[in-house]
């Protein structure tokens, strides 16, 4: 018998430090292009740039206001977009130092306190350009300080302060691009995102021979803009103020500094003679391609034929959101269609694909970033705006080509319109056949609520036990109802070939099922059969 060492069998692959390679953080320095730092590792330079970029002196003076010897704003929330969150820690430290705020643990005892407290909000529930009232209400905030680009829409409840920042621009390069793109006979509107707006007057001064109209920031009732003074009066349009009484925008060329998001860009291209965007980083201009308006006209017709409308709430902070939501619900009901309301945070393809019964989506969101413009058919169902939906539900479909996203304008145009209904809803014979103008097919489910009086809801046994309690959907005469109301989701589930686990067998099959047998035992390396 040999004395060789017995080696136990290896149960897994040998591993050491060289088996796997992990990514390691080589540097903790944060890239802050917006600050134009000469030495990114110099803490003093970073602090000085942050004070100047965000106008912290004016912000601290505003936050330090008092009423009756007490702070006016005690629970302050700071909202940062993703590209500015790197400055949040420094800003909070400076605010705490200047306002004598003592850092506290994130515990709310509910007791009244005369001291100020500061929270940081990041990863907003909806569009980053909107004030996140939902997150602010979690700590019962009485003031939201919004940093970075903002849509400046009227907000619903809370007081807000906008700190847009002071980015730099190569003014001479922009003036050169404008002179190259336009002649002195053309009328030009200068517009930009909110942070770059303070530089527009300087650009206009270098173009004395041009007919230039500047788009200033508007004055809002529940918010203040730090480092910027909006004009008191003017013609308000596109969330901007123009220093004139009336403007025929169709006669103006638009030169926009920075490239807007698709909803904003579509809105601008439908109102100006032409649109040219300028990229401050690369210094290049673009004249297209831009979102197509003809596709929106197709979606209006699809909204007219849709039987089930999903109302997708993509904001809860804008003013008139609840009023518009109630108006849309009433118009959908008057048109004989079914609606469902969804609040899913930030929408994406996977979230909306879970609701197959929805024929079309109507999104309530900010006109800058909160509206989904599906240019590549990424989503399974069309997505329309409230204006497009109400236009499709109206009795006479007449579109002038304008694209309206402002809540107030939509309510003024369609809020008082009454959708006509048949005098006798009990007779289907008077209803004309409906054909889809896109596909040409006959549509029998465009108005499911018109059939509500024909429902014959019956039960297999009154007061007894249902033999088919494993079925989610009960079949009725012509439709499906849940709690006395038509459910198009249940109808859709009923018409599917496969309706879920447990529905793929009938009474004729063996209810006892198969016998349970012993399976394999052991580990994955070797099973005992």
Curated annotation (Swiss-Prot):
Pathway: Protein modification; peptidyl-diphthamide biosynthesis. One of its GO terms (cellular component) is cytoplasm. It holds the Pfam family Diphthamide_syn. One of its GO terms (biological process) is protein histidyl modification to diphthamide. Its main location: cytoplasm. Keywords: Cytoplasm, Iron, Iron-sulfur, Metal-binding. Binds 1 [4Fe-4S] cluster per subunit. The cluster facilitates the reduction of the catalytic iron-sulfur cluster in the DPH1 subunit. Its cofactor is [4Fe-4S] cluster. The keyword Glycosyltransferase does not apply. Gene3D superfamilies: Diphthamide synthesis DPH1/DPH2 domain 1, Diphthamide synthesis DPH1/DPH2 domain 3. GO terms for molecular function: 2-(3-amino-3-carboxypropyl)histidine synthase activity; 4 iron, 4 sulfur cluster binding; metal ion binding. InterPro entries: DHP2, DPH1/DPH2, DPH1/DPH2_1, DPH1/DPH2_3. It is found in: Cytoplasm. Transmembrane segments: none annotated. [4Fe-4S] cluster binds at residues 130, 151, 366. It comes from the Eukaryota. Required for the first step of diphthamide biosynthesis, a post-translational modification of histidine which occurs in elongation factor 2. DPH1 and DPH2 transfer a 3-amino-3-carboxypropyl (ACP) group from S-adenosyl-L-methionine (SAM) to a histidine residue, the reaction is assisted by a reduction system comprising DPH3 and a NADH-dependent reductase, predominantly CBR1. Facilitates the reduction of the catalytic iron-sulfur cluster found in the DPH1 subunit. Belongs to the DPH1/DPH2 family. DPH2 subfamily. PANTHER family: 2-(3-AMINO-3-CARBOXYPROPYL)HISTIDINE SYNTHASE SUBUNIT 2, DIPHTHAMIDE BIOSYNTHESIS PROTEIN. Component of the 2-(3-amino-3-carboxypropyl)histidine synthase complex composed of DPH1, DPH2, DPH3 and a NADH-dependent reductase, predominantly CBR1. This is 2-(3-amino-3-carboxypropyl)histidine synthase subunit 2-2. It comes from Candida albicans (strain SC5314 / ATCC MYA-2876).
């Amino acid at each position: 018998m040999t004395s060789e060492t017995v080696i136990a069998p290896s149960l897994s692959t040998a591993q050491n430090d060289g088996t796997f390679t992990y990514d390691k953080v080589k540097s903790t320095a944060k890239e802050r292009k917006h600050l134009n730092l000469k030495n990114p590792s110099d803490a003093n330079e970073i602090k000085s740039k942050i004070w100047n970029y965000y106008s912290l002196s004016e912000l601290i003076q505003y936050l330090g206001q008092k009423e009756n010897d007490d702070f006016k704003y005690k629970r302050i929330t700071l909202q940062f977009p993703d590209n500015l969150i790197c400055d949040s820690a420094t800003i909070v430290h400076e605010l705490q130092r200047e306002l004598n705020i003592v850092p506290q643990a994130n515990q709310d005892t509910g007791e009244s306190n005369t001291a100020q407290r500061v929270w940081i909000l990041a990863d907003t529930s909806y569009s980053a350009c909107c004030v996140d009232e939902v997150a602010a209400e979690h700590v019962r905030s009485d003031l939201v300080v919004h940093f970075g680009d903002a849509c400046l829409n009227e907000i619903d409840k809370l007081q807000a302060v906008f700190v847009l920042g002071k980015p730099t621009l190569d003014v001479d390069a922009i003036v050169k691009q404008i002179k190259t793109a336009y002649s002195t006979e053309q009328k030009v509107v200068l517009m930009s995102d909110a942070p770059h707006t303070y530089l527009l007057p300087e650009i206009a001064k270098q173009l004395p021979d041009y007919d230039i109209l500047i788009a200033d920031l508007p004055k809002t009732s529940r918010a203040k803009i730090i480092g910027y003074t909006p004009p008191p009066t003017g013609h308000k349009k596109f969330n901007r103020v123009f220093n004139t009484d009336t403007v025929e925008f169709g006669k103006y060329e638009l030169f926009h500094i920075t490239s807007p998001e698709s909803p904003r860009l579509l809105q601008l291209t439908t109102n100006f003679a032409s649109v040219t965007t300028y990229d401050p980083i690369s210094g290049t201009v673009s004249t297209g391609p831009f979102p197509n308006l003809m596709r929106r006209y197709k979606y209006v017709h699809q909204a007219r034929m849709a039987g089930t409308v999903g109302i997708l709430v993509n904001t809860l902070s804008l003013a008139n959101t609840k009023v518009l939501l109630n108006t849309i619900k009433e118009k959908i009901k008057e048109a004989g269609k079914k609606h469902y309301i969804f609040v899913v945070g930030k929408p994406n393809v996977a979230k909306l694909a879970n609701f197959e019964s929805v024929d079309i989506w109507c999104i309530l969101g900010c006109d800058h970033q909160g509206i989904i413009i599906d240019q590549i058919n990424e989503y399974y169902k069309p997505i329309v705006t409230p204006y497009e939906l109400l236009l499709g539900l109206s009795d006479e479909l007449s579109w002038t080509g304008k694209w309206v996203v402002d809540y107030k304008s939509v309510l003024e145009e369609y809020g008082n319109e009454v959708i006509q209904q048949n005098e006798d809803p009990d007779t289907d014979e008077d209803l004309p056949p409906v054909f889809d103008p896109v596909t040409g097919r006959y549509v029998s489910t465009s108005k499911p609520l018109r059939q509500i009086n024909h429902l014959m809801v019956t039960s297999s046994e009154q007061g007894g036990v249902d033999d088919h309690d494993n079925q989610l959907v009960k079949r009725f005469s012509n439709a499906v109802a849940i709690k006395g109301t038509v459910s198009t989701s249940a109808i859709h589930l009923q018409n599917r070939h496969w309706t879920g686990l447990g529905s793929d067998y009938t009474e004729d099959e063996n209810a006892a099922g198969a016998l349970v047998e012993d399976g394999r035992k052991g580990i994955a390396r070797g099973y005992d059969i």
